[in-house]
Swiss-Prot record:
This is ATP synthase subunits region ORF 7. It comes from the Bacteria. GO terms for biological process: cell-cell adhesion. It comes from Fuscovulum blasticum (Rhodobacter blasticus). It holds the Pfam family H_lectin.
Amino acid sequence: MLRLGASVGVHQGSRILFSDFADGGQMWTGNGPREYRLDVTFPEPFTRTPAVTVGLSMWDMDHKTNSRMDIGAENITPQGFQIVFKTWGDTRIARVRADWLAIGSVRDDEDWEIE
């Protein structure tokens, strides 16, 4: 975790969501609404729910069909979140990689708890 001052931290990562061309998966062979979800767990939890942003860093698709996609973060907690990728219609997607960034409050080294 990168710490930005005493109580703000950042986690970031990059994940291949799927490679459906290789195995004939639904994003490549399907039609209509399709969705893929990937659980991401932070290496160290935040103290409160962080702000999370997700973007595409690689998108390999069929040039013969329309390009349609929606990507975002859902079910965000201090421990992690889900990357959600959606497409619809005749879109055929071979592979997708997503990059993400989470920023939020973290414990300070000088914080202490009374039990």
